[in-house]
Amino acid sequence: IRLALKNGASAVAAVAVADESGYQAAFDALSMVEDVSVLICGSTDTAVQKELRDSAAQASQARRERIAVVAGAKDESVDDLIARAKELNHERVVLAAPGALDEEGASASGLAVAAAVAGAIAGETDPAVPLGGAELLGLHGLADRYEDKDLDRLILGGVTPVEHVGGVVTVVRGVTTRTTTGQDPDSTWRELSTIRIVDDVIPSLRSALRAKFRRAKNTEQSRGAIRAQVVLEL
């Protein structure tokens, strides 16, 4: 919570869980909360993260658009992270890496990094601004440093890498875990800014049409007017 707030989140709605089995109920509770833009959880278990992904997707379909940010386990390799992203494979899920260092300088999971990234996403009001280059505050360091070839692999594999250079921790590039559609490679939703722009445009367009065409009949003239209004709004 502290890291999310420190990096830009204006408020945090938290639900406590006793163990891994309690996450689904927590996600269900949060799914009905309005004005939630980013979701995080305190687990690196892939099954729990899939539940978080599904919660974000279902809430978004119900016009409560949101992004989920997850993390890898302690000491996960590049291959492990790419495999995790492949399992999640959704435009509403961001997998942040590497792991963080704790206060004693020991290697830990990526949960702290994910919380900081979530705060940075929540704090950016312009959806078109890329996440890459965003400075992450409050971290004690990173558990790994990626070479350029590894950064390329991670980004193409749906992982959002973070680096520590010159005493500053920053996001290299913000991407989603969506890399395939069916069995085919698909880069349509790779950039995080793509889904964020969609989430910004669609609600605004929906509100404008609702206000202008309240109780309008489904006629050819009305449909033409709606098309014209959509073009105008875009």
Question: Where on the chain are the PLM-derived regions?
Answer:
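Surface-exposed assembly/interface segments
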Residues: I1-L234
